[in-house]
A protein has these predicted regions:
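Membrane-embedded alpha-helical signal segments
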Residues: 1-224
Length: 224
């Protein structure tokens, strides 16, 4: 429609190939879109493999862009369109060096929370398997997920874990899951038995889920 548009994103965190396809499609559009909602709907029709949503808040826009999605700012509109074209650099799912086995699965958790969650769900295809996503760290805004099987895990333990995570007052999880672990089990007295177990193996984590345990996953950390 002759309007200028600006793309706002972080280099290295988005899929440039997909982004170039979107730009080519938008350049071919025939105009007639007088509302930002019309442009969003046009993108969702023509580029069905990308999730598009509107964003009216500046702080929310900045947070989303820093997480990987790309924002489209169209001249004349007060809202922005967020396109989920994230692609984070990651390594393959290798067997953890400290938990090597001669038989069984050879994969291990990686530094991406979404990949780790999918690895768990691939093993436990139960609709009662639940992931609760939280944000921790005023500066890092790290994704932290509580994972459990509804009906197996104790509600009191789930609620206590949820409360501790939501009440954490830190600027960043500098040591990833290690920092999270220390804040979750912080006590003023010594416990003779371990109350927490750390693993980098999806099969071990899933076996604990089936026994009613709760998993806490942090983005940027392969340890659960």
């Amino acid at each position: 429609g002759g309007r200028q548009a600006y793309f706002l994103g972080v280099n290295g965190m988005c899929d440039t190939t997909v982004l170039q396809r979107i730009v080519a499609i938008l350049q071919k559009q025939d105009g007639g879109h007088n509302r930002i909602e019309d442009i969003r709907d046009y993108i969702m029709r023509k580029v069905s493999f990308v999730q598009a949503m509107l964003c009216n808040d500046t702080d929310n826009l900045i947070h989303n862009v820093m997480c990987g999605p790309v924002a489209i700012l169209v001249d004349g509109f007060s809202a922005a369109i967020l396109l989920d074209v994230r692609r984070y650099p990651t390594r393959g799912m290798e067997q953890p060096d400290m938990e090597m086995v001669s038989r069984g699965a050879r994969d291990g958790f990686v530094e991406m929370l979404l990949t780790n969650a999918n690895s768990i769900r691939r093993r436990i295809r139960n609709p009662r398997l639940t992931f609760e996503l939280h944000k921790v760290g005023s500066e890092s805004i790290t994704d932290v997920a509580i994972c459990y099987v509804e009906g197996l895990a104790q509600e009191s333990v789930i609620e206590e874990t949820r409360k501790k995570i939501t009440q954490m007052k830190v600027s960043a999880l500098t040591m990833g899951s290690k920092t999270l672990e220390e804040m979750l089990i912080k006590k003023s007295w010594f416990h003779p038995l371990p109350t927490i177990r750390v693993t980098e193996r999806p099969d071990v984590a899933c076996s604990y889920l089936q026994e009613g345990y709760i998993l806490v996953l942090a983005d940027n950390s392969p340890a659960v």
